[in-house]
């Protein structure tokens, strides 16, 4: 299975903020959308960073309430690790596990195509495992 399969199922909608927005504004977006990370896009819609709950936590740990006034650019993770739609789900799982992150933007030739989360990957893998188990059950039954 490939990243393109996940995007084909879940869609390619991306939630993004700008580098100039405040951390408070980005937190409001995360909360309203009930998500754990937002992509950071510049005025040309180019991916320049990713802002995760962990990034926010580290900023608040360092600056307390003052962190809320920081610009997203001061807190975001950059450079961004990305994946390609032709990458396998197994490869993406390995990237996420080794990098200790839960969201990967999907990019091809500098064009942002979507984002996959660890939840998307785990769900896809569980569904795949269930399908394999059903095929084996049917094979054994015949």
Language model: regions and residue ranges:
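Bateman/CBS regulatory modules and CBS-like beta-alpha motifs in cytosolic regions of diverse proteins
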Residues: 1-29, 35, 40-43, 47-48, ...
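Residue-level recognition of oxygen-bearing side chains
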Residues: 22, 56, 88, 117, ...
């Amino acid at each position: 299975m490939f990243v393109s399969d996940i995007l084909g199922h879940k869609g390619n909608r991306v939630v993004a903020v700008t580098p100039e927005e405040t951390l408070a504004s980005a937190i409001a977006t995360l909360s309203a959308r009930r998500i754990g990370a937002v992509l950071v896009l510049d005025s040309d819609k180019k991916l320049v960073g990713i802002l995760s709950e962990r990034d926010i936590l580290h900023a608040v740990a360092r600056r307390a309430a003052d962190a809320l006034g920081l610009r997203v650019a001061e807190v975001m993770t950059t450079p961004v690790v990305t994946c390609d739609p032709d990458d396998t789900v197994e490869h993406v799982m390995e990237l996420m596990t080794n990098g200790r992150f839960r969201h990967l933007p999907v990019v091809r030739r500098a064009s942002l195509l979507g984002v996959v989360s660890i939840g998307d990957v785990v769900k896809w893998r569980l569904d795949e495992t269930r399908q394999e188990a059903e095929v084996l059950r049917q094979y054994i039954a015949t």
